[in-house]
A protein has these predicted regions:
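Non-catalytic interfacial helical region
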Residues: 4-9, 15-18, 92-217
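Clamp-loader machinery-focused feature within the broader ASCE/P-loop NTPase space
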Residues: 1-136
Length: 217
């Protein structure tokens, strides 16, 4: 198909992860929200989309669902990368034949930013593709997970829960995102991308539960 996905920072829709959303809502409503989370799952399943979705929810002060209205004041600044209470760390673009890792200097800069005075009650640090943390960048993040500043929530996304030092894993609440049913992926392709029904069904069957992968088949 080679269709263009909506970048997670702009994507207000999350497909097929209702159990994960419900778990986050329960944790928030309990009044004892863990300060660190790991969203794990295969590439294209919606990990970063969920992280931004939950970040918008927290920055908006919560609600009945994780879906923040499109006209809410947090939506525009988050999409523009300009919300003062949201800091994002991700790997730099990889060169040919290389696998980029999250740099220790980027982690340190993000931690410095997130510790500054906020405009709201909650600040959010997203570490996207956290499985690319190397030893130095993981150690830089560890202190914030050990002694989190008040009001800071850290959201990591990764392709597996076992790709971190145990010292980091033990300080995170873990959510494994589940494969999305083929029928849901096919219907989504038809609805949002106007893909023919037979083509959508074939792509969904090959995508192994990953909407993002279905766009490239």
């Amino acid at each position: 198909l080679s269709l263009e996905p909506v970048p997670p920072v702009h994507n207000l829709d999350l497909l097929g992860q209702e159990p994960a959303e419900a778990a986050l809502l329960r944790a928030w409503r309990s009044g004892r929200l863990p300060h660190g989370w790991l969203f794990a799952g295969r590439s294209g399943i919606g990990k970063a989309t969920l992280a931004y979705r939950f970040a918008r929810f927290l920055l908006a002060g919560g609600g009945d669902t994780l879906a923040v209205p499109t006209d809410h004041p947090v939506v525009g600044p988050v999409a523009a990368g300009a919300h003062p209470d949201l800091v994002v760390v991700e790997p730099p673009p990889a060169g040919r034949g290389t696998r980029a890792a999250i740099r220790v200097e980027d982690v340190r800069a993000a931690i410095e930013r997130i510790q500054r005075t906020s405009v709201g009650a909650t600040r959010v640090l997203i570490v996207d593709q956290a499985h690319t943390l190397n030893d130095s960048s993981a150690n830089a993040l560890l202190k914030t997970l050990e002694e989190p500043p008040a009001g800071v929530v850290v959201l990591l996304t990764a392709e597996g829960v076992d790709r971190f030092p145990a010292t980091i894993r033990s300080r995170l609440a873990k959510l494994r995102l589940q494969p999305v049913p083929d029928t849901a992926i096919a219907a989504w392709l038809e609805r949002h991308y106007e893909v023919a029904a037979d083509t959508a069904a074939a792509a969904a069957a090959l995508a192994a539960g990953s909407p993002g992968l279905a766009l490239w088949l």
